[in-house]
Amino acid sequence: MASKKARKPNRAEKKLTRSCFKKQVPQHNNINTNTIYSVPSPSPAAVLTSPGGCCTPKAKKSRIPEMLTCPPAPKKQRVSKNCVLRRRQIVFFAPPEIELFFVNAHDR
C-alpha cells in the first residue's frame, strides 16, 4: 500500500485561497503610506446626498410600464406592385429569326 506522502493531493487541498492572488505591496519603513495615498475627503453634504455616486432612479414614474398583453406577431411584408410590373419576360428566341435561319440553311 502506498504511503500518504506519495498520494496525489486532494482537490480541496489544492484549492488556493483568494488572498493568494492579491498583489502584495512592498512596505518601506521610512515612507508613510498614508501621506502618499491620501485623497481629500468630500464634504459631508456630498456624502449624504450621493453615497455611491450614480444610482438608478427607483421612483414609480421612472420605471418602464409593465405590458398587460403580448405584442402581435410581426406580419410578412407584401411585395410592391411596381416590382412585379418591372419584371420582363425572358425571350429565348424570336420566331422571324428562326424562319430566316431555316430558309437560308435550306438554300445552301
From Swiss-Prot:
Keyword Cell cycle set for record: yes
Protein name: Cyclin-dependent protein kinase inhibitor SMR13
Domain of life: Eukaryota
UniProt organism field: Arabidopsis thaliana
UniProt-recorded Gene Ontology molecular function terms: protein kinase inhibitor activity
Keyword Cell cycle: yes
Cross-referenced InterPro entries: SMR
GO biological process: one example: regulation of DNA endoreduplication
Recorded name of the encoding gene: SMR13
Transmembrane segments: none
Disulfide bonds: none
Functional description taken from the UniProt entry: Probable cyclin-dependent protein kinase (CDK) inhibitor that functions as a repressor of mitosis in the endoreduplication cell cycle.
This protein's UniProt keywords: Cell cycle, Protein kinase inhibitor
